[in-house]
Amino acid sequence: MNFPDTPVCEMPFFRGDLRDSNHCAFSKSTCIYLLFEPLRYSCIRLIVMFICVAMITCPNSLRFSQYTFLRSYLTLPSCAYFDFLGTHTSRLKLTPVHIPILVLQRKNNRAYPSDMIYDTCTLDFLFRNLCLHKSCSYVWGQIQSSRRFYRKIDHLA
């Protein structure tokens, strides 16, 4: 199934302040389009839209236990995820998030999962502090449903 080329927040049913790039929290890879398309021209669509936008833009609603992951990304379709390093990265930089960040360490020219770090920050801060370890080669921010590759650690100061 193909995704629309236009970011969801720039589609016709997003109006007013939501068209501001700082509020454009969704990229074409989030499948949000699939959520709203069946609800076109309905009150349900508007309710769902405002709930989703509120959950994305309000950091308090994104807080969750260190022992759990976001469940299917805030109950959205399982294919929904943030493409942090994708083409719409600039739209997400100012969005407050409380998200698991997987730090990969490079060993023998291969990247291995290292540690999970949970913190509340903005993506702008994240992008300016990508290298959290000296051996860190890549920070992967995509939300995953599987836990078996990760281990819990304390917050790094």
Curated annotation (Swiss-Prot):
Subcellular location: Membrane
GO CC list: membrane
Membrane topology (UniProt): Single-pass membrane protein
Keywords in alphabetical order: Membrane, Transmembrane, Transmembrane helix
Primary residence: membrane
Record-annotated membrane-spanning stretches: 42-64
Comment field (misc): Partially overlaps DUS3.
Protein known as: Putative uncharacterized protein YLR400W
Source species of the chain: Saccharomyces cerevisiae (strain ATCC 204508 / S288c)
